[in-house]
Every structure is written in C-alpha cells, then in structure tokens.
C-alpha cells in the first residue's frame, strides 16, 4: 500500500478578497501638464515679481511668548501657591491606617 499525501483543498468559507479587503489597482501617475508661461522667464535683480511679494509678507509668530502664556494659564497663580495652600504639610503615607476590608475613610 502506498502512502498518499493530503490533497490541497482551498477553503470555501473565506476568500482572499474578504480577508484582505478590496484590492487596489496600481495607479500610474499621469504626467502633469505645465501651464505655458504668461510672462517671460527672464528676471532682472532689480525687479520684484508678484510671487516674491507674497513671501515677504509671511510673519513667524513669537513662539517663546506663546509658550510662556500657555504655561502661566495652566498653572493658575503666577506668584506661587494661594494663601490657603501655603504652610500646610501633607502627612506621610506611613501615618495612614487603612480600615479592614477597604471600607470607610483612612484614619490619621
């Protein structure tokens, strides 16, 4: 008796397209059509073009001032802690006694 290996049977319940999702066809980028120049390409150093004027008007915001303003608005009081917080010392965690079973408030 000769041994026969298992024959390959494709699964019928799931298709590859269902596992992976819809296949995208590779797209070939179309060459972009350049617009014919309306003015001559010659640019003399003394002349300004319309494109150059827009670049000169861009302003960089002051990042340091913005960061300082944000940090002050998040912390609240600029001079430090408020008077009701100053002078209070938090108890150490070793001084707390937790009640049995985790019910109730911790005792000091």
From Swiss-Prot:
Alphabetical list of InterPro entries matching this protein: GAGE, GAGE_fam
Region (Disordered): 20-108
A Pfam match: GAGE
Biased segments, Basic and acidic residues type: 40-52, 94-108
Protein family membership: Belongs to the GAGE family.
UniProt protein name: X antigen family member 5
Organism whose genome encodes this protein: Homo sapiens (Human)
Lineage of origin: Eukaryota, Metazoa, Chordata, Craniata, Vertebrata
């Amino acid at each position: 008796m000769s041994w026969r290996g298992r024959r390959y049977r494709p699964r019928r319940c799931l298709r590859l397209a269902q596992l992976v999702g819809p296949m995208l066809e590779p797209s070939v980028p179309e060459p972009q059509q350049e617009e014919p120049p309306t003015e001559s390409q010659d640019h003399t150093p003394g002349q300004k073009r319309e494109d150059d004027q827009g670049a000169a008007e861009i302003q960089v915001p002051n990042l340091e001032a913005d960061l300082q303003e944000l940090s002050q608005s998040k912390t609240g009081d600029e001079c430090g802690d408020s008077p009701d917080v100053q002078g209070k010392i938090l108890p150490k965690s070793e001084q707390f006694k937790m009640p049995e079973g985790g019910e109730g408030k911790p005792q000091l």
